[in-house]
UniProtKB/Swiss-Prot annotation:
Expressed by the venom gland. Keywords: Amidation, Disulfide bond, Ion channel impairing toxin, Neurotoxin, Potassium channel impairing toxin, Secreted, Signal, Toxin. It holds the Pfam family Toxin_2. Transmembrane segments: none annotated. GO terms for molecular function: ion channel inhibitor activity; potassium channel regulator activity; toxin activity. Disulfide bonds join C29-C50, C35-C55, C39-C57, C45-C60. This is Potassium channel toxin alpha-KTx 6.7. One of its GO terms (cellular component) is extracellular region. Blocker of voltage-gated potassium channels. It comes from the Eukaryota. The keyword Secreted applies. InterPro entries: Scorpion_toxin-like_sf (IPR036574), Scorpion_toxinS_K_inh (IPR001947).
Amino acid sequence: MNAKFILLLLVVTTTMLLPDTQGAEVIKCRTPKDCADPCRKQTGCPHGKCMNRTCRCNRCG
């Protein structure tokens, strides 16, 4: 019983701590500057990161 409760807490905590990102569309990049225009078109905000040669767009405020 205790192990199930701990596992449930771990799952809930993990989902709460995941970053708020959008991006079903795969955008190839080499630098974060490559992500600004595609992210602006996708989310309306130029905030994005280039991670593993793929843009990860973040929402504004």
